[in-house]
Amino acid sequence: MDNHGPRYPYPYGQYPYPYPYPAPYRPPSSEPYPPPPTNQYSAPYYPYPPPPYATPPPYASPPPPHQHTSGSHSGPLDYSHNPQPSSLAAAPPEYHRHSFDYQPSPYPYQPQGNFGAYGPPPPHYSYQEPAQYPPPETKPQEPLPPPQQTQGFQEYRRQDCLSTGGTGHDNVSNSGSSYPPVDELLGGLHISTNQPGPSVPQLSSLPSNSWQSRPGDLYGYPNSSFPSNSHLPQLGRVDSSSSYYASTESPHSADMQMTLFGKGSLKVLLLHGNLDIWIYHAKNLPNMDMFHKTLGDMFGRLPGKIEGQLTSKITSDPYVSVSVAGAVIGRTYVMSNSENPVWMQHFYVPVAHHAAEVHFVVKDSDVVGSQLIGLVTIPVEQIYSGAKIEGTYPILNSNGKPCKPGANLSLSIQYTPMDKLSVYHHGVGAGPDYQGVPGTYFPLRKGGTVRLYQDAHVPEGMLPGIRLDNGMSYEHGKCWHDMFDAIRQARRLIYITGWSVWHKVKLIRDKLGPASECTLGELLRSKSQEGVRVLLLIWDDPTSRSILGYKTDGVMATHDEETRRFFKHSSVQVLLCPRNAGKRHSWVKQREVGTIYTHHQKNVIVDADAGGNRRKIIAFVGGLDLCDGRYDTPQHPLFRTLQTIHKDDFHNPTFTGNLSGCPREPWHDLHSKIDGPAAYDVLTNFEERWLKAAKPSGIKKFKTSYDDALLRIDRIPDILGVSDTPTVSENDPEAWHVQIFRSIDSNSVKGFPKDPKDATCKNLVCGKNVLIDMSIHTAYVKAIRAAQHFIYIENQYFIGSSYNWNAHKDIGANNLIPMEIALKIAEKIRANERFAAYIVIPMWPEGVPTGAATQRILYWQHKTIQMMYETIYKALVETGLEGAFSPQDYLNFFCLGNREMVDGIDNSGTGSPSNANTPQALSRKSRRFMVYVHSKGMVVDDEYVVIGSANINQRSMEGTRDTEIAMGAYQPQHTWARKHSGPRGQIYGYRMSLWAEHMATLDDCFTQPESIECVRKVRTMGERNWKQFAAEEVSDMRGHLLKYPVEVDRKGKVRPLPGSETFPDVGGNIVGSFIAIQENLTI
């Protein structure tokens, strides 16, 4: 989102959905892993759309429990009988999967490439098994006896929830407390000491009572496929500020465990890798819908139609969610009206959790909530060796007893650690067979070109020249110039999506002439008069209204109603799109989604000249909205442009009241232009969203329909299709391979399958009453895991991995990104290899820094940073390097700021705030302000780049909150695998250009960001710049990079800087404060 604080709250909620990368699977075959080919991926590259798939390969999934890996099977598999234990399968595929045992059916758009990512490949496809991870040589032991006792279920807040009566609700609680009541939970807890055990315990060495002695699991995080404030089970009340969560210092202590039944403890181990899980079926589930059955029996006695309509049996609608350390990592679809459901569903999911058990929670889905049926737990110690655990297990209730005689769940689970997943060992890879990020809706598109942008505009000569390989020089892009030219040159279509689009914004401001006087609205209106189809898809801010002459600007000040009114009598079609929940969601959930969440994508899609009187599609993707406050240059002026290029474009939501003489808020952002096949995927995203938003409902059915507004480019002869668009040879040093990622769900797009069993054909995740594309999170995890040297991130937010915080583990910020970065660094420390992570964030979230929402965001950010440094320090201690290095030799956080002396003429305006102690007066006196980092980008090893609209927090990564889009790209001729040294392609030039902007210099050590010399040099520059920014004396700042104003000691403890506990001039605790407000307002 783009604004914060009381003026623009940025509410966040819990993460209600897992992180599986779904993929279609055939029924388990007898040969799940064929001999490896010469390279890891050999699926051919198809045109768009690809041809219908042939019969899926027989190896596409692991075998079911009843089928052995030897032999062959030429006919359909029979799943009518109970699965029996089988021999251990070979190592699973190396990517996250989540699939059903159903034959995928053709659909209009079929992504292609790697079969796991884009659907089944042709029969000749083969998959490489990781050579260094041989299959276990022994068969698994018989299923272990069922536990006689089991702990109470941990926190499953906002999804899998259960009241004391057994029923949970999916809607948001209306109580004032931020946390659900579970006070008496501690009353049943038993503290036990857990002696260190073997790091990789053998199944045969497990204690005989391991099933009877489940540990208390108080680093449980919300199982949030179904948002709710209730827990599972509801055992009393815990206040977050005073509970065990708030006081626990160790996020993953192996020395102390809590058990609800006092039956011993289990060892907490780090699961970092992938889990290969099959959920086959359940039997003899209890009927949880007895109330409905009673009503049915009552009405069944009535004569006539009612009797005939109620004769069918009413029973449970079960589903299973899989959680590790309380964070949901997988979820089956709901089987309606079944006490013997058969799912045959597969998950291949990334994990980065300290946990003692894996939980399989069986629930009954209801319209108003969900009821607990029971639980199956698998101790992590049993799977840690890599052995496949498979069998049928009794489903136990919260008392540790069978929920019903004979009720059981058949499943299998196998863990593959990171060091056995070779796909993450070589960066983006080399050669034509690399297929990008698997398990995504859109495939990797080869042979395109990309232009990378920093800020809205870079004037000529403002940044230094950067030499690249092949004697080339990096060319600094001019984003809004290029957008203006692309729109002006369009002949067929101009499609724009935005969180905010303002018709008054001027894209060209550095030249004299008509272009500099032309507003965006005038440009679009003139193009529509030329016959170009101009469509604007803008988020409909629910707080802005224009009804019968009554107008409100809205809390977010997005100008949505103003822009709609401007184009009202033109041929430009403006569709204001609210962020709606599905019809099957509860009323409260619908209100929450519609009020809190947004459409956050920022795209411009136009047709462009393809030569030969043909047209092609190009697209702009990134973080820049076409609205006020966004135009800026790498100088990021505060006062000097207030009477020139920013005269009619003042933006600074930090200040309230009199703005006279205040500094503007400088704006730093990242954007990109895509030319090639991937641009058509951006077009597909727009079409899917437009068709969904244009579908009339309610009173809108009587209004003008927008359904026919989209151009059918396949029916326009002069517009090339994706398979015909010009491509660049992979051998061309300027060739790019590009992939589009999204965070979005089926409530915001048209085209997702209605049947969840068909969802895996498009690599979608199942949620309650919704299908989810969360491939942005998938892409970040893949890129971080594959990083070998350094990671450079610029992002508006940095919150996540709350399941590993030292407090408030249950808020639901469960995205893996911060934990994956910390574990990557820890892995490199243990390997005695250099690695560095540089993370640039805003000084504070946009808005009033003393506001409750802003302070809570800073608090969660502090918890995230603290967790990462503690993880790094632990690795230093384990390797005996804590004396030689500190955590900041590997990980550093920065922000941006600027300061201007008064030049000859003070352009800050006339007058000054009357109160000398207001933030306005103090900022004008000190002549300093932060540069707001609105970027959403990451560079890995100078070979891979991600740029989009998604922030690093739950709201952007979850897929069911804000809608987001991003692109990931690399140049095949500029990778470590090909060069065997640091690549010097366009991505390297882009990163160096950003550093030149932030530090006002280019040092030789910048070419090796992972080196200790570079890390310390950059940190020293940031510390020096912060001192200049915070000093009493006013001076011009050359560089803008500031060390984030917290103190990190050698043990990784993060504290406020002594004497600088609050932000200069504007106030607000730098490390935030815990203020009890609704969680989804801040994560």
From Swiss-Prot:
GO annotation terms (biological process): defense response to bacterium; lipid catabolic process
EC number: 3.1.4.4
Residues binding a 1,2-diacyl-sn-glycero-3-phosphate: H600, Q796, H934
Induction statement: Activated by wounding, methyl jasmonate, heavy metal, osmotic and salt stresses.
pH behavior: Optimum pH is 6.5 to 7.5.
Protein name: Phospholipase D beta 1
Compositionally biased spans, kind Polar residues: 191-213, 222-231
Species assigned in the record: Arabidopsis thaliana (Mouse-ear cress)
Biased composition (Pro residues): 26-38, 46-66, 132-148
UniProt-listed InterPro entries: C2_dom (IPR000008), C2_domain_sf (IPR035892), PLipase_D/transphosphatidylase (IPR001736), PLipase_D_C (IPR024632), PLipase_D_fam (IPR015679)
Record carries keyword Secreted: no
Keywords: Calcium, Cytoplasm, Hydrolase, Lipid degradation, Lipid metabolism, Membrane, Metal-binding, Repeat
